[in-house]
């Protein structure tokens, strides 16, 4: 597995990154529709595994890669998992799949292969789809939204074979 990038994340779009004992705290700009994020200082291509161990204080633990987004504790319905396709930005809503307990650590794994992707949270497969992700290059990031704050203990990008 690639080294933990937690100490190298760059604040983006008004994001504030604060060191805490167990990692970092990421707070947004407190402006609605501004997607503040802690951005990795590298561009990656599929196939990859994007892994975050993080928590939210309320809503919106979000992972970003290109046009794709994984949203846990979505502000409109905390129980609905939201997944936006990295190639097409098509939005998928999965009722009953998106809630994580607040102020507790959760492992979020977003595997993006050349022809498919899947989202696994705390060891449970929550979403899987087909797609052509071979030509995408982008920097992964993690962030809060709409007033939430998140904490991140681990941020890893691993090439998949």
Question: What does each of the following model-derived ranges do?
Answer:
Residues 62-64, 118-120, 156:
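Beta-strand signatures of extracellular beta-sandwich domains
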Residues 126-156:
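Flexible glycan-contacting loops in extracellular carbohydrate-active proteins
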Residues 50-52, 103-121:
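Short tryptophan-centered beta-strand motifs in secreted/extracellular beta-sheet-rich domains
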Residues 14-19, 24, 70-76, 110, ...:
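Short, exposed beta-strand/loop patches in secreted or surface proteins that constitute
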Residues 1-45, 116:
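Low-complexity, Ser/Thr/Pro/Gly-rich disordered linker/stalk regions
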Residues 24-85:
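Secretory/extracellular carbohydrate-interaction modules
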């Amino acid at each position: 597995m690639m080294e933990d990038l937690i100490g190298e994340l760059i604040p983006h779009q008004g994001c504030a990154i604060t060191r805490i004992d167990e990692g970092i705290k990421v707070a947004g700009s407190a402006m609605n529709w501004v997607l503040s994020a802690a951005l990795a200082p590298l561009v990656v291509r599929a196939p990859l595994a994007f892994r975050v161990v993080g928590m939210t204080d309320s809503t919106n633990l979000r992972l970003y890669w290109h046009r794709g987004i994984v949203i846990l504790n979505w502000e409109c319905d905390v129980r609905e998992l939201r997944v936006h396709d990295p190639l097409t930005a098509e939005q998928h809503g999965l009722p009953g799949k998106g809630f994580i307990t607040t102020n507790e650590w959760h492992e979020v794994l977003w595997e993006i292969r050349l022809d498919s992707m899947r989202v696994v949270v705390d060891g449970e497969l929550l979403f899987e789809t087909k797609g052509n992700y071979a030509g995408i290059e982008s920097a992964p990031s993690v962030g809060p939204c709409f007033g939430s704050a998140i904490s991140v203990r681990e941020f890893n990008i691993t090439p998949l074979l």
